[in-house]
Amino acid sequence: MKLSPSLIMLAQGLPLAARLLPLFAAEETPPRARWEHEYGGDRWSYLAGLDEAAHYSVIVGYYALLQPGGSVLDVGCGEGILQSRLAPHGYRRYLGIDFAAGAIERVEARRDRATDFQVADATSFTTDQAFDVIIFNESLYYFCDPAAVVERYLGFLAGDGVVIVSMVIARNRIAIWNALAPLVETVDETTVFNRARVGWTVKALRRRAEL
């Protein structure tokens, strides 16, 4: 697949392979085996660094202001970086799901009464629990039909709950945001950039009243 110069520029300043992956179409998402291999090494270790702090801070800020101390479902939690950012603010319950068993193995020691991690395919995951906050942190663009995924997860959202979506800025993200518009209304949105001028849009969303 040929990437346009503008998309290449978006990848500058951060690990190249890690930045190019989300720019591909969802159907080119690596299979489970590749994700397991990557989590077995240090491929995603940069996510815990300063270059990623801006969008994590916005996500945590929305949580702390809109649903402080609530229950959280983190879809595509990886190695639990977001959980470590949320924990100092407190939560009633946190569940992180990821289909890479290698990622979940790395956070086994963090499980406690309020914190759990589960190996699960987000497209088939189900629960009888309702969450105050559902977070898609750099995970939504990996799905073939992001809007269908969000619509499904709205069924797991508490009545006054909030969906928080963070996506690195790229041309093909516009279509995803537009596809979400009939399902959710924007409570607030923030765009942030790091020193390498890589940017993220983070939105706090609520289910539309008519749904």
Predicted features, each with a name:
Residues 149-159:
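A short glycine-rich, Lys/Arg-flanked "PGG" loop and its adjoining helix->strand segment in the class I
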Residues 79-123:
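Class I SAM-dependent methyltransferase SAM/SAH-binding core
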Residues 126-134:
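A short acidic, Gly/Pro-enriched loop at the edge of an enzyme's catalytic core
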Residues 69-78:
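Conserved class I S-adenosyl-L-methionine
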Residues 43-58:
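Conserved SAM-binding loop and adjacent beta-strand
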Residues 2-42:
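N-terminal, positively charged/glycine-rich alpha-helical extensions of SAM-dependent methyltransferases
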